[in-house]
Amino acid sequence: ILTELFAVIEDRKANLPDDSYTASLFTHEKGENAVLEKLGEETTELILAAKDDDHEEIAHESADIVYHLLVLLAMKDMDVADLRAELADRR
């Protein structure tokens, strides 16, 4: 699913459809800071969900973090393979 999601993100980056939240992140006036702020916000929400032991919210916020992380990778001209390689090196 990560590869599929990343392909959609790359498509939005290339085509910048007007009605796409993902595309709006690539054209945001704050640039990558908009994504970095979202990552911080979503991480805080994940911490709060974990403290509340709210499994549904933990899954939701984790997905938000993964999504925004993939957008950041695309902004930096990286991809899922870079992430996989780093994780493999840590085995």
Region locations from a protein language model:
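Flexible "arm" and connector segments at domain edges
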Residues: 1-62, 66-91
